[in-house]
Structures are given as structure tokens and as C-alpha cells.
Amino acid sequence: FKIGSIMGIPVKIHITFLLILPVFALVFSINEPPLGFAGTTPLILNYALSLLTTILLFACILLHELGHSYIAKSYGVEIKDITLLLFGGVSSMEEIPRIPSQELRMAFAGPFVSFVIGVVLLVLNYIVVSFVPGYADTSIWLMFYILGSINIILGLFNLLPAFPMDGGRLLRAWYAKRMSYIKATHYAASFGKMFAVLMGILGLFFNPWLILIAFFVYIGASEEDKSTTISILLEKYI
């Protein structure tokens, strides 16, 4: 359901967002520093900081999506809405720019926003911890450290060269400078599928979460390949 608008773009939240919100807050509350607030504050304040950190994290994800949307709008692409859901955020666009240079800038805009947020939070946090007496004894510095670190990780994760991550679109834009858009999509999707299989194999030995992410990546790559091919073929006959 809709919660507001930014830059004329409706912002919505999916029911899965409401389900994941308390889960993230719980994770932050039970993990010890620097990954959480366990043992740093009284229990009620711990939960409050954990929930606030979770809300601010999804606000950062919204800014990440707004980065994509801002560049897309500058190229005349209509943005239907931005939806926050279980695994982050999604910008619904009428179409993806097929000019490689435009898609490249649009795809990189999201990770760039995440990197800027992460670096600014970590640098400011370091400066304040170093020069403001007593600040290091509070849990506020920990909240900004967590948010800064996660934004850097979010930016790096989204640069993985596989759909539906931004890195998959960057890879397609690189291919599209050298071949047709359909073929570029197919190559980028195939690379993403191989990447997902490798990630799934690693997940069997190291972390089961990698298997879930691999499944998500494989399906995303397959759907992008299929939807792009159908869209372009329909344009030729309509």
C-alpha cells in the first residue's frame, strides 16, 4: 500500500516488508557489537535502537532506488512506483533504457548512492568518535557504524554481475555496445545463471543463505532474459 510520494514517484510497502521489519530489528537486538546492540543498553532502549536502525536501513534502500529513478526520469522514463519489500526495494519502470550508456548510468546510480551514504556515515562517525568526548560511550555511534557498513556491503552486492542486481544491467550495457540488445541480455543472463550455480555450490559447504540467494539470482536472470526477448519481439510485430 502507498505511504507517500517522492519526486512525484509513489512509494509503496509490500506486506513482506512489514513481516521482515521485526525480524531485522530482532537480529540487531540479539547480536553483539559491532553487528548489533546486545549488552550495550537497557533492554527497552536496545529494542528501540534496533527498530530505528532497521527503519533507517530501509530508508537507505529507498534512497538507493531513488538514485535509479532520478537518472531514469532524466532520460524520460516513467517511474510507476517504488516498492519496499522482503529483499529490499524495486523501482517499477515503464521500460528500461536500451541505449547502453543510459542503462549503464541508471544501473550504477543505485550502488553509487549506497556507497556515498556508507562512506559519509563511516567518516563522520569516525570523526565524532575521535573528537567528541563521551560520544563513544553511547550506542548512537554503533547505529551509524552499522548503517554505514551495510550500505557499503549493499553497494558491493548490487554490483555482482548477475540479474536482478544492478551489476547484471551493467554487464548487459557493456555487451550491448558490442551486439544486439537481445543477445546482450541473453549473454548477461547466462553469466548470471552460472554465477548463481557457483554461489549455490558454495552455499552447500559454507552458508545455506547463499543457496537462497542463488535461487533468487537464477530466477531473476531467467525472467529478465525471457521478458526482454518477448518485449522486443512484440515491438517488431505490433
Task: Please provide the spans of the model-predicted regions.
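Hydrophobic transmembrane alpha-helices and their immediate loop junctions
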Residues: F1-I238
